């Protein structure tokens, strides 16, 4: 039913590693960029190239091709940031419009300046396109924040959720039960789901 109230919808990438730090790590290692340099790499004003963001393997393939064409590492990484952010905006919003204020969470957003800059460049475009009302006198980029400890928010949420669970949930029940689950239980669960 329509209530006229807005609903907060926390969301995490659940589709593919293409929108995660794992892809950044893998491509960064291939390009041999020191971590300290990666953290300071920019996005603003850097030439972008088409990179698939839907799949980490596709992104890596595109980056490999661009690298062979002589595209410099700063342009490769900025293009990867763009691909990841655009994919995440598609997957995470699931057709909804992000409301101000947006929190950027997770390690890549915490540590990599170019990722933060990319979000701050792309989210305001969506707000403008969709006519989202923003607080007066506040630059749109200031409504996109990376809180202290952003890299730990998912873990903190898991802990908070776990505090509400029964004390027996998540306790190690011995090798026998683990072995049973790996050899039998997992297959039984798949069969129940029709898999």
Predicted ranges, named:
Residues 5, 157-195:
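Acidic, glycine/GT-rich loop-and beta-edge segments that sit at the periphery of enzyme/chaperone cores
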């Amino acid at each position: 039913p329509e209530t006229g109230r807005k609903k907060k919808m926390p969301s995490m990438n659940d589709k593919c590693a293409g929108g995660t730090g794992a892809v950044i790590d893998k491509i960064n290692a291939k390009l041999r960029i020191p971590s300290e340099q990666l953290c300071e790499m920019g996005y603003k004003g850097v030439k972008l190239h088409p990179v698939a963001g839907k799949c980490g393997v596709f992104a890596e393939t595109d980056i490999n091709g661009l690298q062979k064409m002589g595209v410099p590492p700063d342009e490769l990484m900025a293009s990867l940031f763009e691909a990841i952010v655009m994919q995440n905006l598609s997957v995470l919003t699931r057709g909804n419009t992000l409301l101000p204020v947006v929190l950027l969470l997770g390690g890549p957003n915490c540590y990599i300046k170019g990722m933060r800059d990319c979000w701050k460049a792309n989210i305001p475009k969506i707000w403008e396109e969709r006519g989202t009302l923003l607080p007066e006198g506040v630059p749109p980029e200031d409504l996109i924040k990376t809180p202290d400890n952003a890299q730990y928010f998912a873990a903190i949420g898991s802990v908070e959720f776990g505090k509400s669970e029964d004390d027996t949930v998540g306790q190690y029940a011995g090798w026998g039960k683990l072995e049973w689950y790996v050899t039998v239980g997992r297959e039984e669960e798949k069969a129940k789901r029709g898999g």
